Amino acid sequence: MVTRRLSTNVHIDLQPIRQGILLPFHDRPAEMRDLAKCNDQFFRNVRDTISEPKFTQLMELWLEKSRAEVPDADFLMTTRNIMLSFPSNEEQGHQRSASHGSTSSATSTPKRLSISSMDPARIHLWRQFCNVVGYDMPTPGEQKEAPPSPAQEAIPESPVEEAIASDSDEEEEEEIKA
């Protein structure tokens, strides 16, 4: 008789990130490699949309950086910035110094871009990425935690939450018209 062990108890440290997102990857590079294999077409679409150099940056982040090296919130924010083509802090500083004749970018804050002003194809890719890595809807009645960090604030809400919000706006408009 052959015995097989069906499961192993593994301790996974979860890192707090924006409400609605859960990335419980114990070994992020290995799990991202598995996700890339299972979602090959999606990852090709990302490469074709964002350019080869940016895709190479993402692959390095996804496949080589552990949770100890890059916390979950930073992992998501960096992925989002690259996928949506937000300029990095270094690029922003270079752009500001070129336009204002300044050489220091340490005192200026990065410009926040709204999701409505971005390329819909890139927004769609970002949302697909979030679905690939997993969303966990917040528990109703959840207690308020400490205010989110700037890295957590930069991560957009769940597409499900955005859809629910837009549906309720449409219903309100219909009620007003009636």
Swiss-Prot record:
Record keyword Nucleus present: yes
Stretches with biased composition (Low complexity): 98-109
Keywords, ordered alphabetically: Cytoplasm, Nucleus
Gene Ontology cellular component annotations, sorted alphabetically: cytosol; nucleus
Location, primary (coarse class): cytoplasm
Keyword DNA-binding: no
Subcellular location: Cytoplasm; Nucleus
Segments of skewed composition (Acidic residues): 167-178
Region (Disordered): 89-115, 136-178
Protein name: Uncharacterized protein C191.01
